[in-house]
Structures are given as structure tokens and as C-alpha cells.
């Protein structure tokens, strides 16, 4: 059976390849000093008995849904959007970091960023940040 904690560690490892981030968290921190990335459970966090075409383990396949929060700067900073743009597209993007190893270090069968769900003001705890929320699907048996 897939190991949820190991998958989160694999995601964190891939995000740590992005230049410019001060830190990557696989749990929601009490305090974040941007630029950072945070891995949080998506909705629903886990789906069991998912099928993929040509899968021999269709009854065991699980889909793990995550949100990757990229917090570029405090919301009011003028340069925050330019920093954020590089994380949502281009060679230094979150998409390319995950695509660089879709097995997340061997913990998953496949992983893919499916969309940028939000771009703009992101509230984490009591702080407002210019950020983006990216949806990540991870498939594992």
C-alpha cells in the first residue's frame, strides 16, 4: 500500500529543486517567511480503488490529491507578481519540478500538476501573501 508520508516527502524533495525558495514545508507551518512552498492535503485527500487505463493493479490504485501553495512575498510588495510568475510557468516552475521525477523518488506511479487553481492573495494563518495554489494528483499502489 502507498505511503502517504513518503509521498509528501517525495513532493517536498522535488520542490526543493526550485531556486529562490527559502524553505519547502510538507506540513503547514505556524509561520512562513516567503518565498516558500507548502504541501497541503487536497480535496479529497485520498481516493481508493481508482482505475487507470492498462493498470494491472486497478483495484489497489490510489489517488492522492495535494495543493502546493507557493507564497512569493507579502501581498502588498510590488515585485511579488514577477516572482510568482516564475513558479507557475517556465523552466523554474512547480510544474517542471514535479515533471522532473513523476515517481517522486519511487514513492508513486505518477504525479502531475493539473492546474493553477488560484493566483493572487493567499491567506495562511494570519498572514496575507501574493501566492498561487497548484493542484497536484499523485497515483500510487
Predicted regions and their residues:
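Charged, amphipathic alpha-helical segments and their flanking helix caps
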Residues: 1-33, 43-141
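A short glycine-rich, His/Asp/Glu-containing loop-to-beta-strand
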Residues: 35-39
Amino acid at each position: 500500500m502507498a505511503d502517504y508520508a513518503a509521498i509528501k516527502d517525495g513532493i517536498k524533495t522535488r520542490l526543493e529543486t526550485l531556486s529562490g525558495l527559502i524553505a519547502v514545508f510538507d506540513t503547514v507551518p505556524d509561520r512562513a517567511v516567503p518565498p516558500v512552498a507548502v504541501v497541503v492535503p487536497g480535496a479529497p485527500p485520498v481516493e481508493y480503488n481508482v482505475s487507470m487505463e492498462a493498470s494491472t493493479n486497478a483495484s489497489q490504485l490510489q489517488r492522492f490529491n495535494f495543493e502546493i501553495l507557493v507564497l512569493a512575498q507579502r501581498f502588498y510588495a510590488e515585485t511579488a507578481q514577477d516572482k510568482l510568475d516564475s513558479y507557475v510557468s517556465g523552466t523554474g516552475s512547480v510544474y517542471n519540478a514535479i515533471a522532473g521525477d513523476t515517481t517522486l523518488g519511487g514513492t508513486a506511479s505518477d504525479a502531475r500538476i493539473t492546474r493553477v487553481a488560484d493566483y493572487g492573495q493567499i491567506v495562511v494563518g494570519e498572514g496575507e501573501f501574493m501566492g498561487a495554489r497548484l493542484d497536484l494528483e499523485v497515483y500510487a499502489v
